[in-house]
Amino acid sequence: MKLTCMMIVAVLFLTAWTFVTADDSGNGMEILFPKAGHEMENLEVSNRVKPCRKEGQLCDPIFQNCCRGWNCVLFCV
């Protein structure tokens, strides 16, 4: 019984801790992972827009690198 109560308290504590420490800002990952040194030195390169894939081209489902309006399912469709 004591072990069960301790487990419940631990789970509640960890859940509360997760919500308290969560970063709710829109650019949280940008703050956690600052730009690489070479991007900071050459701002023109870092601000360049990366090319997108057009309809029918191979794409990366993880990064969703298709142009706007297209969905990535191995190919931009």
UniProtKB/Swiss-Prot annotation:
Tissues expressing the protein: Expressed by the venom duct.
Q: Which residues form the propeptide?
A: 23-48
Q: Which GO terms describe its cellular component?
A: extracellular region
Biological role: Delta-conotoxins bind to site 6 of voltage-gated sodium channels (Nav) and inhibit the inactivation process. This toxin shows weak activity on rNav1.2/SCN2A (EC(50)=2.5 uM) and rNav1.4/SCN4A (EC(50)=4.8 uM). In vivo, injection of this peptide in the head region of garden snail induces retraction of the head and body into shell. This is followed by secretion of viscous green slime and a convulsive undulation into and out of the shell. No apparent biological activity was observed when a much greater dose of peptide was injected intraperitoneally into mice.
Q: Which family does it belong to?
A: Belongs to the conotoxin O1 superfamily.
The UniProt keywords, alphabetically, are: Disulfide bond, Ion channel impairing toxin, Knottin, Neurotoxin, Secreted, Signal, Toxin, Voltage-gated sodium channel impairing toxin
What is the protein's name according to its record?
Answer: Delta-conotoxin GmVIA
Q: Which Pfam families match?
A: Conotoxin
Q: What else is known?
A: Negative results: does not show effect on hNav1.7/SCN9A.
Range of residues in the leader sequence: 1-22
**Any S-S bridges, and between which cysteines?**
C52-C67, C59-C72, C66-C76
**Domain text:** The presence of a 'disulfide through disulfide knot' structurally defines this protein as a knottin.
